[in-house]
Amino acid sequence: MTLFTSGDWQVDVSDFNKDRFTTHALFDFMCERFPILKDADVEVNQVDLTNEYGYGFCQVDEDGEFLIHIHNDLSYEDYVTTLIHELVHVKQTLQGLKDDEMRESEAYFWEHILSKEFNASPLSGTPISQIPA
């Protein structure tokens, strides 16, 4: 498992917003939930997606390496939720799930459950007072 970070990072450590620590902690958290991710090479690229249809998307190259593009101006909550959603797509690709409707349905299902679980965990680095209800 290798996690790379690239792009135009908008780091604000004071409110734990999308810093590399959060990204790596979230990836470790997801690997605990879905061990198949441990075998993946993933790059998280923060980029301006203002003119795109969503907050993030996932690609896989010919070498089997995954590239997750994620909007660089999201709130902490949206960043965590979006990265979880895209990492679920990585898991699905590794498992061979190709049906787009099933992929999106499962990703939306997990993003809600796992974002709450991650934010309540010590891995998030989020102070208890800032954990969304």
Regions found by a protein language model. Give the residues of each.
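Short, intrinsically disordered N-terminal pre-domain segments
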Residues: M1-F4, A133
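Active-site recognition of the HExxH zinc-binding catalytic motif
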Residues: T81-L94
